[in-house]
């Protein structure tokens, strides 16, 4: 364990096109092998498609999608007396955002549309409409936490 405490979190810079730190974080999650230019092109194309298809501001649609995907509760394994319990815990705000972004990108990659920008645009629009695989993942996570509510007193 480090003697000086945890290292300071680095702040991400706001995206130059949409002036949003959340968009920068989505680009970082999309990025593979350090190719930031490719990732930002994919995202901007997806946002253009969202604007065409919905007629709304793509940033607002994306923020609505994030609100629908971010989990409130999750389960964490805790060992008590030789058996493992899935203990429901509240999700920290920074982890909520990270999980939401991760799930949107993960389920966009597994979709069947032709290009990644198509997949990402569809996943964001589905999430904004409270449908789609990433919203289902959040509901499954909440269902798991609800099912294990009896073990909530094992929180630490």
Swiss-Prot record:
InterPro entries: Ribosomal_uS7, Ribosomal_uS7_bac/org-type, Ribosomal_uS7_CS, Ribosomal_uS7_dom, Ribosomal_uS7_dom_sf. GO terms for cellular component: small ribosomal subunit. CDD domains: uS7_Bacteria. Keywords: Ribonucleoprotein, Ribosomal protein, RNA-binding, rRNA-binding, tRNA-binding. One of its GO terms (biological process) is translation. Disulfide bonds: none annotated. PANTHER family: RIBOSOMAL PROTEIN S7. One of the primary rRNA binding proteins, it binds directly to 16S rRNA where it nucleates assembly of the head domain of the 30S subunit. Is located at the subunit interface close to the decoding center, probably blocks exit of the E-site tRNA. Part of the 30S ribosomal subunit. Contacts proteins S9 and S11. HAMAP family: Ribosomal_uS7_B. This is Small ribosomal subunit protein uS7. It comes from Lactiplantibacillus plantarum (strain ATCC BAA-793 / NCIMB 8826 / WCFS1). The gene is rpsG.
């Amino acid at each position: 364990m480090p003697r000086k405490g945890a290292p300071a979190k680095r702040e991400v810079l706001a995206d130059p096109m949409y002036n949003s730190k959340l968009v920068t974080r989505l680009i970082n999650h999309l990025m593979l092998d350090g190719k930031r230019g490719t990732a930002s092109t994919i995202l901007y194309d997806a946002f253009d498609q969202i604007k065409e298809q919905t007629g709304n501001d793509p940033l607002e649609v994306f923020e609505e999608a994030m609100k629908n995907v971010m989990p409130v509760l999750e389960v964490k394994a805790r060992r008590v007396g030789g058996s493992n319990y899935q203990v429901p815990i509240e999700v920290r705000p920074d982890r909520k955002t990270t999980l939401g972004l991760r799930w949107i990108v993960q389920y966009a990659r597994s979709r069947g549309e032709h290009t990644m920008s198509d997949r990402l645009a569809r996943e964001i629009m589905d999430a904004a409409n409270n449908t789609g695989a990433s919203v289902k993942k959040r509901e499954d996570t909440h269902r798991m936490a609800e099912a294990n509510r009896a073990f909530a007193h094992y929180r630490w």
